[in-house]
Amino acid sequence: MVNPIATLLLECGAIEFGEFVLASGARSSYYIDIKAATTNPAVLTEIGKTIAEGREFEMVAGVAVGAVPIAVAVSLASGRPYAVVRKEGKDHGKAGTIIGDVLGKNVLLVEDVTTSGGSALYGLEALRAAGAHVDQVVTVVDREAGAREALAEKGASLLALVRVSELLDG
């Protein structure tokens, strides 16, 4: 396999082939356990470096909980601050949906796995509502099930470190 991130995901057990029943009840010939990658320091470090390289952004953000380790890894690799998009706002302490000052900043949104793009769209809208400029999303794995198109409709591009078709073809 040529894609070094795909190789790392396979080696750490984040991608398995076989017969699986997904949460939706659908059957799949592969399973993505991205937590096997994001809880592995060596793999997470490489993911962070790969995302940070050659991109222009002032801040990185991830939607809780899955994308937060990725946002931290990108922050450490780039030296730029990170923000967290909560799934639900809170009404005590520092209330709100966003942890971090994103107002007026060019924010790179990261995701662990994209399918239809629901989580990425939620993060995109929440960040924009908080005054951030967001036009790019980077995901570790894209299942190629509509996320790219959904984000494009909102004026954001999606870059995948690994596309499922690469894994199935390779």
From Swiss-Prot:
Reactions the enzyme catalyzes: orotidine 5'-phosphate + diphosphate = orotate + 5-phospho-alpha-D-ribose 1-diphosphate
Record keywords: Glycosyltransferase, Magnesium, Pyrimidine biosynthesis, Transferase
The keyword Transferase belongs to this UniProt entry's keyword annotation: yes
Enzyme Commission no: 2.4.2.10
Subunit structure: Homodimer.
Entry binding sites for orotate: 115, 143
Enzyme class label: transferase
Example of a GO MF term: magnesium ion binding
Cofactor(s) named in the record: Mg(2+)
Gene responsible for this protein: pyrE
Record-linked CDD domains: PRTases_typeI (cd06223)
Keyword Transferase set for record: yes
Pathway in which the depicted protein is active: Pyrimidine metabolism; UMP biosynthesis via de novo pathway; UMP from orotate: step 1/2
The name this protein goes by in its record: Orotate phosphoribosyltransferase
Function as written in the Swiss-Prot or TrEMBL entry: Catalyzes the transfer of a ribosyl phosphate group from 5-phosphoribose 1-diphosphate to orotate, leading to the formation of orotidine monophosphate (OMP).
Highest taxon listed in the record's lineage: Archaea
GO biological process assignments: 'de novo' UMP biosynthetic process; pyrimidine nucleobase biosynthetic process
Family as reported in the entry's similarity comment: Belongs to the purine/pyrimidine phosphoribosyltransferase family. PyrE subfamily.
Residues noted as binding 5-phospho-alpha-D-ribose 1-diphosphate in the record, renumbered to the chain: 86-87, 90, 92, 111-119
HAMAP family in alphabetical order: PyrE
